[in-house]
Amino acid sequence: MAASKVKQDMPPPGGYGPIDYKRNLPRRGLSGYSMLAIGIGTLIYGHWSIMKWNRERRRLQIEDFEARIALLPLLQAETDRRTLQMLRENLEEEAIIMKDVPDWKVGESVFHTTRWVPPLIGELYGLRTTEEALHASHGFMWYT
């Protein structure tokens, strides 16, 4: 048996073309100094805008406080009027309830003073529904 000849692969005539073996790195972008400058500029702009907004917010808050101070006497007068009306209604109800009790003085103060004592919520809402008393004592806290 004759051994077969092995054919070895060889380059093409004239050789292979040049191989590009250099690293192909993309462009690096901004330098470190420019990125630092942009960052510091952004921080300064943010600080300035927050400072500007805080001044505006403080101005609006002062305006709200001044409006509240201007309206406070009106609101206090309405509250006093409502309180006195409720006290009058309570006195009328007390007169109806206690009409058969001898020596009962309608509207006699439980405090031994002639000074005005603001009534407690229990005094004002003692003859009213529980819902009214809860609304007066807790207000709008139900909705939060």
From Swiss-Prot:
Keywords: Acetylation, Apoptosis, Disease variant, Electron transport, Host-virus interaction, Membrane, Mitochondrion, Mitochondrion inner membrane, Nucleus, Primary mitochondrial disease, Respiratory chain, Transmembrane, Transmembrane helix, Transport. InterPro entries: GRIM-19. GO terms for biological process: aerobic respiration; cellular response to interferon-beta; cellular response to retinoic acid; extrinsic apoptotic signaling pathway; mitochondrial respiratory chain complex I assembly; negative regulation of DNA-templated transcription; positive regulation of execution phase of apoptosis; positive regulation of protein catabolic process. Changing K5N: In a Hurthle cell variant of papillary carcinoma sample. Widely expressed, with highest expression in heart, skeletal muscle, liver, kidney and placenta. In intestinal mucosa, down-regulated in areas involved in Crohn disease and ulcerative colitis. Coiled coil: none annotated. Residues 102-144 are annotated as: Important for inducing cell death. The chain crosses the membrane at residues 30-51. Belongs to the complex I NDUFA13 subunit family. It is linked to Hurthle cell thyroid carcinoma: A rare type of thyroid cancer accounting for only about 3-10% of all differentiated thyroid cancers. These neoplasms are considered a variant of follicular carcinoma of the thyroid and are referred to as follicular carcinoma, oxyphilic type. This is NADH dehydrogenase [ubiquinone] 1 alpha subcomplex subunit 13. The lineage of its organism: Eukaryota, Metazoa, Chordata, Craniata, Vertebrata.
